[in-house]
Amino acid sequence: MRKKLLSTLLATAMAVTMLAGCGSNGGQQASTPATENKTETSAEAKTDDTAGTTTTEGGKIGVAMPTKDLQRWNQDGTNMEAQLKEAGYEVDLQYASNDIPTQVSQIENMINSGCQMLVIASIDGDSLGTVLEQAKEKDIPVIAYDRLIMNSDAVTYYATFDNYMVGTKQGEYIRDQLDLDNAAGPFNIELVTGDPGDNNARFFFGGAMDVLQPYIDAGKLVVKSGQTDFETVATANWSTETAQSRMDAIISANYADGTKLDAVLCSNDSTALGVTNSLEANYTGEWPIITGQDCDKPNVKNMISGKQSMSIFKDTRTLASKVVEMVDAVMKGGEAPVNDTTTYDNGTGVIPSYLCEPVFADASNYKELLIDSGYYTAVSYTHLTLPTTSRV
């Protein structure tokens, strides 16, 4: 089923890309599921040019992040900068305030200011083709960070978490918490995913729906709003406010009469926060299961207080460490370590990739995963306790 889904996503998204340019972002093709190809290997990059690298330690690395508005990108950038500097590199770290022209300008400046390699978390996967042509002309390798850059043959490697697995873990959590294989049902669920210009959003949603769709088809899960297709449930810029506004409308139309809402699939924490805000203001029934991703601090607090059921934890220290390893290998004239050479096609060919494995956090294990590991300090959470009536 996963092969069929990912192939369908690629075909659909590539068609949208050709018709809409910088509109909805393209999907990726999987001739072999990512989780079936996790043995780390060293693979040649899609392009053979390495003239822009140096065989000695040191050099200047450009790191382009999309925004500081989401906590996770702050942590990604900070972790990356610290580890690259520790490895002996000069770092040009830039945030673009979710503005595409700003990010394009920042990358252009990195290219012209002597950066020998680029690590880019794109705002929109289809928006960087022209500026990356400049990088290609100067033989500057490019690592797409967490978000695949589409339709550019300048992309050398891709580093991310297993985004399909993120979605399946969210779907499995809902399945298990509602005991869908044994309970009579039906249960009401609503669906909220991410930005249509973010390639990962289709993977998150696709993975979750591979788990949940059979129960929807069987009538055990019911989407009362009727909103189930990706374009309808997508949330521009992963905006908390947009997710909240849409959830306000869904509650008003479908749950204001006391109808029970059992679960809300949210692909990440910023959308989950919007859904939570809406429920607090408008919903009077038993609190539903709410999923998320990124373990942002406000959402961890909501998990502890019973307002959010779980969040996928993607330890950015792990991803940053792997990217530094990849950068170091290429800068020394070698090949970056990868563990997937079949899944991520950006429209110009398969991009050699390294996929880190995500885990999920909830009220039972957040302390071990987030605090005991040093990812967060306990100061912000010590005054909160889990309610005895929580469903999580």
Q: Which role does the model predict for each range below?
A:
Residues 11-17:
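Bacterial N-terminal signal peptides
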